[in-house]
């Protein structure tokens, strides 16, 4: 028991989301009278040069992904005959034309999709806008990735590196820009897929939800507040956040006294 108290004192900030009643997605599958469509999303923080490996290792990683996933995907279809697709949130700092061309072929064959992952630190509004617009345009015009909406604008899904969306770390590291919501919206971001991040300190109090967040000028962590997304309801100004699952796992707890966190990580 003494050990448990010490553990809570040291790591209690990681569990603040547990006390939050904010869960917008309350509707259960049994509430529907019609057919139910189930969507499974795998949001891969794809960094082929992870661990500062050489080009040859990064090429091997991408080649293996393309070969093995397409082989596995061909064996499965949904009721419409579509094969599973893997979504690569490609790291902007790992940009490499050869690797992206390999992923483009996988996407063209119907087995994948590419979105954006951006990591930055101590950044400015101008520099962040330049980076996100530059990688967006390069992926679309040079590699045939991403897509356009009905108005002809390039759109993309987004994951923030180190989960520090809207400068959400208390120490201000791993970001530096308080108002990322309007910058993302203006550059074509249709949704953010960053969370959950627990047990990291960046975890929002809103959990297990699909919701919109409005910007709060000059104030960080605007996505800590929001309103539920609804069918046939869209916002041109507020950012859509699509969260993965987050809950407590009592079956694999610490010494049978404290739960672990289930955050959907693979």
Task: List PLM regions with ranges.
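Well-ordered, non-membrane alpha-helical segments in soluble/globular domains
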Residues: 56-74, 99-100, 128-142, 173-183, ...
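Noncatalytic linker/hinge segments flanking ATPase motor cores
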Residues: 80-83, 125-135, 196-202
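Short, solvent-exposed polar/charged micro-motifs at secondary-structure junctions
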Residues: 96-100, 126, 168, 204-205
